[in-house]
């Protein structure tokens, strides 16, 4: 038995059976048992979800399955889904650094084979919650690169990340037009 204070948001409204998980559990005690089964009790602050099958009702896309296969806890997107159209903040921290670490250790050829060939702006703007974790190839012009130092000791220890770069990229629109503002009928 794993006791935790939070579960993936999708699990709150459905029965969960056979879903792969990962958790850092502290052993509490040996619980009840018999000759066929022994119960172990663990406490954990968080349970990570590593789904293996897409499920539109649970917002699990093929892209999230690919990330989960690399060890990325896709439940970390739960708080991010509510923060679209806002700056990156502390609430995005764990998901952000796990994404950097996961993509950083992945095989480049495997990533390229799963990537969408170009960034399609329409779905990113219209329905960003369905795009989280989508792997895309970004073609554009780098206008500025800023080195961001990471001072968090736990990020250094867990992921080996002491810096990253923030690159401002201009993406060519080609024949596409982007309309900002309200659409009148």
Task: Please name every model-derived segment.
Residues 1-185:
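OB-fold and OB-like single-stranded nucleic-acid-recognition modules
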